[in-house]
């Protein structure tokens, strides 16, 4: 599953994508070979990055690649019934608690993978989800730093960053 997840990064693009070519059927197992065991490990992905860095785009790509995946975003709290987004900072704490309850319920129900699509800029935003991993049957926690994954050329003229050395986990896009 981890390899497929990493492949999702490679398919991210701002351009319209062509459908992938069909995969050839798997060859039948050799006689006497035990059947391949499927991984039943549960996964929680914490997407982390500034607004506009591509977290929601990646979350949707992952959900496309893994149809059983559920996305939980605190932003959903601020959508009105008519579909309009209306952020109110006075309700931010309540919105985070609401999202955590939804994620906890999904974990307890054995849903996997679970994708947390929040900015998660502060440790207090991520900590409840990390704690849930140890309180439930989730086995793997992945924190993805979006500022190292998504390059958006149209945003380049509005951004500035200091010169820095490449870090071992950084992916140049």
UniProtKB/Swiss-Prot annotation:
Signal peptide start-end: none
Region (Disordered) spans which residues?
Answer: 1-35
Record keywords, A-Z: Developmental protein
Ranges of Pro residues composition bias in the record:
18-32
- Can the keyword Ribonucleoprotein be found in this entry's annotation? no
What does the entry say induces or represses the expression of this protein?
Up-regulated by USF1. Up-regulated by FOXO1.
Which superkingdom? Answer: Eukaryota
InterPro entries (alphabetical): NEDD4-bd_p2, P-loop_NTPase
UniProt subunit comment: Interacts with dynactin subunit proteins, including DCTN4, DCTN5 and DCTN5.
Q: What does this protein do?
A: Might play a role in adipocyte differentiation and triglyceride accumulation.
**Per its record, how is this protein called by name?**
NEDD4-binding protein 2-like 1
Gene name per UniProt: N4BP2L1
């Amino acid at each position: 599953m981890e390899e497929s997840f990493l492949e999702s990064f490679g398919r991210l693009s701002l351009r319209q994508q062509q459908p992938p070519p069909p995969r050839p059927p798997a060859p039948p197992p050799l006689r006497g070979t035990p059947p391949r065991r499927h991984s039943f490990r549960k996964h929680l992905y914490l997407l982390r990055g500034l607004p506009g860095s591509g977290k929601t785009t990646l979350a949707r790509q992952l959900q496309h690649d893994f149809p059983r995946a559920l996305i939980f975003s605190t932003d959903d709290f601020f959508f009105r019934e008519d579909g309009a987004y209306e952020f109110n900072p006075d309700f931010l704490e309540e919105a985070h608690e609401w999202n955590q309850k939804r994620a906890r319920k999904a974990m307890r129900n054995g849903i996997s993978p679970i994708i947390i699509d929040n900015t998660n800029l502060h440790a207090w935003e991520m900590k409840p989800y990390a704690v849930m991993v140890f309180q439930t049957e989730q086995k793997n926690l992945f924190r993805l730093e979006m500022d190292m994954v998504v390059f958006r050329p149209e945003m380049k003229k509005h951004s500035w960053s200091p010169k820095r050395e490449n870090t071992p986990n950084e992916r140049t896009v």
